[in-house]
């Protein structure tokens, strides 16, 4: 039963991660297909570039929540269903491995969207949501570093590299 619950959660988190929020928001609010404008990516950075600040931030928050919300709920309830098996086999890995696999699931969904011909974004916001669920201090620090360097330099790619480097320097 435990493996069935795990499989259900893995698939549910994958499907949740597969929702192409940038694509949906772009089509709903400005009738723009992010796949055909800007960088062609459906993630928050291209949404910011093509749709503007308000909608780009909304896409970031929704993509962030695709990682943060399910993993936070899972971590909260894991003590009830993730027990250490009496005998470890490949089919019954330890709880840490199960949580790690569940954390990867929305990332895979975002990158290989079931609703977008298995194409998606880079899963940066979703990954930040997962990191924040595991360790809020690290996640929030990364977001703050990113915001500072995005404001200073105006390039999301450069801000991402600097933010991830600084997070590793301070917490790695």
Swiss-Prot record:
It is a multi-pass membrane protein. It comes from Onion yellows phytoplasma (strain OY-M). One of its GO terms (biological process) is phospholipid biosynthetic process. The lineage of its organism: Bacteria, Bacillati, Mycoplasmatota, Mollicutes, Acholeplasmatales. Pathway: Lipid metabolism; phospholipid metabolism. This is Glycerol-3-phosphate acyltransferase. Its EC number is 2.3.1.275. One of its GO terms (molecular function) is acyl-phosphate glycerol-3-phosphate acyltransferase activity. Probably interacts with PlsX. Keywords: Cell membrane, Lipid biosynthesis, Lipid metabolism, Membrane, Phospholipid biosynthesis, Phospholipid metabolism, Transferase, Transmembrane, Transmembrane helix.
């Amino acid at each position: 039963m435990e493996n069935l619950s795990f499989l259900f959660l893995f698939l549910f988190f994958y499907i949740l991660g597969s929702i192409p929020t940038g694509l949906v928001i772009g089509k709903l609010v400005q009738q723009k297909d992010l796949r055909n404008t800007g960088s062609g990516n459906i993630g928050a950075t291209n949404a910011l570039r093509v749709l503007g600040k308000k909608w780009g931030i909304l896409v970031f928050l929704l993509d962030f929540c695709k990682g943060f919300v399910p993993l936070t709920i899972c971590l909260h309830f894991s003590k009830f269903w993730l027990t250490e098996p009496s005998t470890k086999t490949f089919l019954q890995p330890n709880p840490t491995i199960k949580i790690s696999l569940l954390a990867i699931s929305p990332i895979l969904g975002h990158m290989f969207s079931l609703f977008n011909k298995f194409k998606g974004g880079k899963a940066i916001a979703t990954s930040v949501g997962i990191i924040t669920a595991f360790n809020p201090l690290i996640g929030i620090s990364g977001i703050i570093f990113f915001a500072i360097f995005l404001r200073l330099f105006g390039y999301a790619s450069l801000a991402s590299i600097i933010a991830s480097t600084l997070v590793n320097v301070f917490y790695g």
